[in-house]
A protein has these predicted regions:
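C-terminal nucleotide
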Residues: 2-15, 40-74, 169-258
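ATP-binding N-lobe of GHMP and related small-molecule kinases
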Residues: 1-115, 119-135, 140-144, 149, ...
Length: 262
């Protein structure tokens, strides 16, 4: 974009999760940490309502108009940016933008490249438009973009650690209250190794949403016996026999996945 002026540059990291797989959307506790791989975005405002995006990694462009845009089948990578724009437009006006992005977070490796793109886009839009939206609200906005626009019913952990991660620290997060604490993790006598299994995964076309539905189905099935519960976080080890007794062969996966959470 040779005519771009006053560019803004932001970055957002990927993450690994030390404790708490699939517990964030069950209102549980998680302990992720940011990694030294990021998505970098550079942007500038335009004089119209169009958003022009260029991905260096994909060597691909995507363009849409803020006044009328939809989910893109042709450029699915752009939907994370489109979704964040859609969330901002619920409470403020946006100018058109030129956006260039590049990253070194391996895609489809479970390191939350999508959350990093959402968080980076949210920071970029805030800074380009001089908004005062705080980081917690940006985290919630980024999660909603993935839930409501992209269509993945993710929890809030990935966006949280991408926004608030700090070098040398893990982040202990209560996914119900959103209370969090940065925990020093110097690892002087140990190292965290991130190993690529070679198995590609993508939340949009995976069974991620099904796992969430099964966990919620277990909660609904248990409510007649445990009326006080609202999520699997409220179910204790002593309640495991109740999970195992849920009737129906079609609920076998529900029993297994919900038991794993507890």
């Amino acid at each position: 974009f040779p005519d771009a002026t006053d560019p803004v540059i932001v970055q957002a990291p990927g993450r690994v999760n030390l404790i708490g797989e699939h517990t964030d959307y069950n209102d549980g506790f998680v302990l992720p940490m940011a990694i030294n791989a990021h998505i970098l975005l550079a942007g500038s405002v335009r004089n119209d309502s169009e958003v022009h995006i260029y991905s260096i990694d994909f060597q691909a462009k995507s363009t849409f108009n803020l006044k009328n845009f939809i989910f893109s089948q042709e450029a699915p990578w752009s939907n994370y940016i489109r979704g964040v724009c859609a969330m901002f437009l619920e409470f403020t006006e946006l100018k058109g933008m030129n956006i260039v992005l590049q990253g070194d977070i391996p895609q489809g490796a479970g390191l939350s490249s999508s959350a990093a793109l959402e968080v980076g886009t949210a920071l970029l839009i805030r800074n380009l438009h001089g908004l005062n939206t705080d980081k917690i609200d940006l985290i919630k906005l980024a999660q909603r973009a993935e839930n409501e626009f992209v269509g993945v019913q993710c929890g809030i952990m990935d966006q949280f650690i991408s926004m608030l991660g700090k070098a040398g620290h893990a982040l202990f997060l209560d996914c119900r209250s959103l209370d969090y604490q940065l925990v020093p993790a110097p690892f002087t006598e140990a190292k965290i190794m991130v190993v690529n299994s070679g198995v590609k995964r993508g939340l949009v076309d995976s069974e991620y949403n099904l796992r969430r539905e099964q966990c919620q189905a277990a909660v609904e099935a248990l409510k007649p016996l445990l009326p006080e519960i609202t999520a699997l976080r409220d179910v204790c080890l002593e309640h495991l026999p109740l999970i195992e007794q849920l009737p129906g062969e079609d609920r076998k996966s529900t029993r297994l996945n919900s038991s794993h959470q507890i």
